[in-house]
Amino acid sequence: MNTANAPAEGSVHEWKCELDKANGKWSYYDNGTAWITYTDNFWKSHLGQVVQWVGEILNKEDDMPGTSGEKCSFTECQCKVDGAGYVDAGFSAADAKSDDGSEWGCERVSGTAFNIWDKNPNT
């Protein structure tokens, strides 16, 4: 992942996070390429219990991806169940929330999609 250069406007990406239980290794992928891994023996006998899809910024002053007119869309969201394949996220309206509703918007589109945006871009 090229953290120095944000993705181009309108670009499409696939991000994935997976646990290899046999090795206790989490791998984070950007468009199919592992860009960071984390290994700890703890994960050989434990599973992740919570899945979160987050539109995140580094500093509070940074702009969140998207604007009210051009929202940033997370689509086809799924999670992998231990010993099985991927299943749809199953988002409810209550799942779409913002830490600061005066700054950042979030709306549920479907059970597998939501939009985020900065309510005050460039400020």
Positions of the model-derived regions?
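Exposed, interaction-prone regions of secreted/extracellular proteins
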Residues: 1-123
